[in-house]
Amino acid sequence: MGRKCNNNDYLREQYSKYIKLNKNTINICEGNYARIVSDNNSKLLGVCLRGTDYLLYHHPMQPQIEVVVKEAKKYFKLLNCDYYYIATEDYALLKSFEKYLPKEKIITYNAGNVRQVDGLIGEQIRKDKSATDAALDYLTTLYILNKCSVLIGGKCRATIVASYRKNPPYEYVNIIDTHKSY
């Protein structure tokens, strides 16, 4: 059983089989997607980095933004993408991406909505929103990551779930594991 849980094809099959979004949730996610992507045929490159709020909790350390940007630029050009979809809750990370990538090519959904945090970012988000709204935002982020053709990012729950939830699989995926934790 342990080997199967590390197999993305197996996880993708299980996810598709057992985890289904209801029609209302799909409509909400699709509506949020349509608000940021004007052309449904646009080819997106998803970039996902989590914030650094887990310093005391031994979560995976995220790669340096320069490493992610270099890889993203390479595959954006190689695979003829139209937009970078940036998925991060961290305002400072979003601003860093805007320094390295052309702003007119960046799209986001609620990215950078946390500017200062004292504790966990998730706790901060839940102070500002209901649990339902926070969950719908997270599902929308995953939904849009699954609309992308490419996924590049640091090791975190969102990149891992997005990688095996996408069916068919991405044209290219790289979840960068620094093999370090905070």
Spans of model-derived segments:
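Secretory-pathway luminal glycosyltransferase catalytic domains
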Residues: 1-81
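N-terminal cationic-hydrophobic initiation segments that often serve targeting/anchoring roles
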Residues: 37, 73-77, 98, 145, ...
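Hydrophobic beta-strand segments of well-ordered beta-sheets in folded domains
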Residues: 42-45, 82-84, 105-106, 148-151, ...
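Catalytic donor nucleotide-activated moiety binding site of glycosyltransferases and closely related
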Residues: 48-53, 79-130
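A short acidic (Asp/Glu
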Residues: 57-60, 94-100, 162-165
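Glycosyltransferase-associated regions of secretory-pathway enzymes
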Residues: 59, 121-126, 177-182
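Short, flexible loop segments at the rims of nucleotide/cofactor-binding pockets, characterized by
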Residues: 61-62, 127-133
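A donor-sugar binding/catalytic signature common to diverse glycosyltransferases
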Residues: 137-180
